């Protein structure tokens, strides 16, 4: 089915460096039906998809409340619970992604409602330039095995979704198939084909989950760019060390008319350690 990908592999050739297959380049170890993913180093993760917060169009008072609530949400994660925020912009092949709900009524105007709904969907699609913007939070814990990790992750997941609910933000946990579908879409840019996968395919075919999501090839030989199949991409790294940041920074990046993925890897630092780090940085800063 996709065994040919193992032959093409990830072109990562160099001196004394073996070529990896496309599957071997994908760094997770196993994906479970309930959405628990095992990573190297005994780390287990889960992902929750959430919708946008209407921050930019809110009043100043509401923005303050939203910011305060979001800060409390982030403070839920202590130093033992690393997490990642992912913002993915993709070209839309269908306008059904945009949800506009005008309920039907028992009168003669449902045709007008349908027409108005279609018009709103078209306007939303045009305003986004055909870009679908999705948001995810992934959190992980170290554990000896899946039996230990699963109940702990489920508790964190329930807390995260409860915090989103208090913010008025709809959220939904991602099961294993949904996470695989997301990875598949990331590794097959602009692919219009639906993701075809069922857990019963694993024992029937003898393939692993990576065989269903891996691209034909991954090429990382260039220092600044990489290639997935026939598409080229680039990665930029930004380390944020500023004491203050504009609340528009992320929004302005995500509003670019481009397919891209922005990830924020966040590790809460113990308060005492943070104070020591800030004090040391202050002492070592050069004077002018």
Annotate each language-model stretch with its function.
Residues 1-286:
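Extended, folded cores of ATP/NTP-driven motor/assembly subunits in large transport
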């Amino acid at each position: 089915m996709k065994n040919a990908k193992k032959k093409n592999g990830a072109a990562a050739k160099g001196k004394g460096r073996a070529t990896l297959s496309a599957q071997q380049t994908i760094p997770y170890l196993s994906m479970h039906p309930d959405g628990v993913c095992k990573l190297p180093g005994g780390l287990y993760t889960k992902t929750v998809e959430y919708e946008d917060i209407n921050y930019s169009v809110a009043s100043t008072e509401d923005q303050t409340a939203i910011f305060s609530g979001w800060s409390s949400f982030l403070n839920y994660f202590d130093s033992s619970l690393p997490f990642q925020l992912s913002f993915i912009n993709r070209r839309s092949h269908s306008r059904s992604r945009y949800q506009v709900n005008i309920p039907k009524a028992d009168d003669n105007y449902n045709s007008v409602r349908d027409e108005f709904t279609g018009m709103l969907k078209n306007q939303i699609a045009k305003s986004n330039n055909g870009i679908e913007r999705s948001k995810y939070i992934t959190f992980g814990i170290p554990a000896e095995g899946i039996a230990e990790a699963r109940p702990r992750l489920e508790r964190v997941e329930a807390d995260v979704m409860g915090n989103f609910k208090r913010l008025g933000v709809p959220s939904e946990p991602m099961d294993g198939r949904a996470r695989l579908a997301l990875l598949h879409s990331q590794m097959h840019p602009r692919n219009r084909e639906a993701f075809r996968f069922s857990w019963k395919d694993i024992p029937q075919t003898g393939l692993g989950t990576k065989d269903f999501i891996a691209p034909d090839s991954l090429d990382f030989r260039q220092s600044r760019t990489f290639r997935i199949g026939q598409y080229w991409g680039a990665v930029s790294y930004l380390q944020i060390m500023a004491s203050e940041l504009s609340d528009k920074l992320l929004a302005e990046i995500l509003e670019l008319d481009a397919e891209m993925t922005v990830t924020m890897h966040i590790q809460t630092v113990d308060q005492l350690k943070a104070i020591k780090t800030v004090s040391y940085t202050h002492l070592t800063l050069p004077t002018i």
